[in-house]
A protein has these predicted regions:
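Conserved catalytic motifs of the protein kinase core domain
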Residues: 47, 95, 190-192, 211
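Short strand-connecting beta-turns/loops that link adjacent beta-strands
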Residues: 91-93, 209-211, 264
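Short helix-capping segments at alpha-helix termini
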Residues: 24, 75-80, 167-168, 240
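Hydrophobic packing residues in well-ordered alpha-helices of helical domains and bundles
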Residues: 64, 117-121, 174, 264, ...
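ATP-binding pocket architecture of kinase catalytic cores
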Residues: 30-148, 164
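Helix-rich C-terminal or lid/interface subdomains of diverse kinases
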Residues: 108, 231-309
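An alpha-helical support segment within catalytic cores of ATP-dependent transferases
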Residues: 5-28, 90-91, 104, 114-115, ...
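Active-site Asp-x-Gly
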Residues: 59, 192-195, 200-256, 260
C-alpha cells in the first residue's frame, strides 16, 4: 500500500492556490492552519471563510464524494445550514479534497444550545426523516442494522465495573437497564430513515444566542435507526435537551429512551476503553460526554412504555 503523505501547510497552500473557484481563499498567500479539534491534520482552515478537508485513505474518499451529493439532498429539508463545496477534486493518488464554505458559529462542544436551539435540532431530526430513502440509496448511502441494546448493556456492565475500580463511575446506575427493559427498547420494525450517525458536539455549529446554525460531518450517514441520532445528541448537548428535541420532532417514548440508553452504554464503554489504553480521545471530553448522557430526564419515570413510536 502506498503511504499517504501527511499534509503540511505548504501542501495546503499549493493546493488552494491552484483552485480557480476558491476566490479569496486562493490568494497569493492564504492563511492556513490545521483544525485542532478532532486531533487530525487532514482538515485545515483556509483564511476566515473556508475549510479544506482531505481524505486520508480510499474508503474516506468514497464517503467524501458521497457526502457532497448527500448534502445537496438534505439541504432543503433539515432547517439548518450544511456546508457548501466551492471546489473539489483529488489531492493525491485518487484521494479527494473538498474546499467548503465555513459556517459562522462555534462548536457545540464550547457553545451551549438554548431552548430555541433545541427547536433547531428538532427541525434537523424531522428533516432527516423526510429525506427520500430511495434517493439516498441512489447516492450510495448504506443501510445499517439496528444495534442490540442487550449486547451493548452486557458490554457496558463490564466497562462500568472497570470504571468503578478507577473511581470513575457507580455501576449501580446501570441497574435501571434490566435485560427485560433492554428487550422492550429493541429497535422497532419500521422503515429506515436517514441517520446522520455522527452528531457529536464538534459537528454542531452554534451561534452566540444558542441557535444551532449548521451541521457538519455527513460522511458517516446511513439509512437506519433514528435512535442513533438521539443518542448522538444526548452525548453532544445532554440527555434532557436531546429528548426534548426528539419529542418536538415527533418521536415517542420508546425511541427516545432507546437513544438515551445507547448513549449511556456507549459513553461508559468508551471511557473504560480509553483508560485501558485501547481507544483515543481526550479524557476530559470523554468524562464530559458521559456526564451529559447520564443527566436525568423526566421520561425515565415512565414504567410502561407506550406501543407507538
Amino acid at each position: 500500500m502506498t503511504q499517504v503523505p501527511t499534509p503540511t501547510a505548504d501542501t495546503v497552500r499549493r493546493l488552494v492556490r491552484s483552485l480557480p473557484a476558491a476566490g479569496e481563499a486562493a490568494g497569493a498567500g492564504p492563511d492556513v492552519r490545521p483544525v485542532t479539534e478532532g486531533g487530525e491534520h487532514f482538515t485545515w482552515w483556509v483564511g476566515t471563510r473556508h475549510v479544506l478537508r482531505l481524505a486520508p485513505e480510499g474508503e474516506a474518499a468514497v464517503r467524501r464524494r458521497r457526502e457532497l451529493r448527500l448534502r445537496d439532498l438534505v439541504r432543503p429539508l433539515v432547517g439548518v445550514a450544511v456546508p457548501t463545496s466551492v471546489a473539489h477534486g483529488d489531492w493525491a493518488g485518487g484521494l479527494t479534497y473538498t474546499l467548503d464554505t465555513r459556517l459562522p458559529g462555534r462548536s457545540g462542544e464550547v457553545q451551549h444550545v438554548s431552548a430555541v436551539g433545541e427547536a433547531d435540532l428538532a427541525g434537523l431530526l424531522t428533516g432527516l426523516r423526510e429525506v427520500s430513502v430511495r434517493q439516498a440509496e441512489a447516492l450510495g448511502v448504506p443501510r445499517a442494522a439496528p444495534r442490540s441494546l442487550e449486547e451493548l448493556r452486557t458490554a457496558a456492565e463490564g466497562a462500568a465495573e472497570r470504571l468503578a475500580a478507577a473511581d470513575e463511575f457507580d455501576p449501580g446506575r446501570l441497574a435501571q437497564l434490566t435485560p427485560p427493559a433492554a428487550g422492550q427498547l429493541a429497535a422497532q420494525t419500521a422503515a429506515a430513515v436517514l441517520v446522520h450517525h455522527d452528531l457529536k458536539g464538534e459537528h454542531l455549529v452554534v451561534s452566540a444566542d444558542g441557535r444551532v446554525r449548521g451541521v457538519l460531518g455527513w460522511t458517516d450517514a446511513v439509512l437506519g435507526d433514528p435512535a442513533e441520532d438521539i443518542a448522538g445528541l444526548a452525548i453532544a448537548v445532554g440527555a434532557p435537551a436531546a429528548v426534548r428535541a426528539a419529542t418536538l420532532a415527533g418521536y415517542g417514548a420508546r425511541p427516545c429512551l432507546r437513544g438515551l440508553w445507547l448513549s449511556r452504554c456507549d459513553t461508559v464503554i468508551r471511557l473504560a476503553e480509553r483508560l485501558r489504553g485501547r481507544a483515543e480521545g481526550p479524557l476530559p471530553l470523554l468524562r464530559t460526554q458521559l456526564g451529559r448522557a447520564w443527566e436525568p430526564i423526566l421520561l425515565e419515570r415512565v414504567t410502561e412504555l407506550p406501543g407507538d413510536d
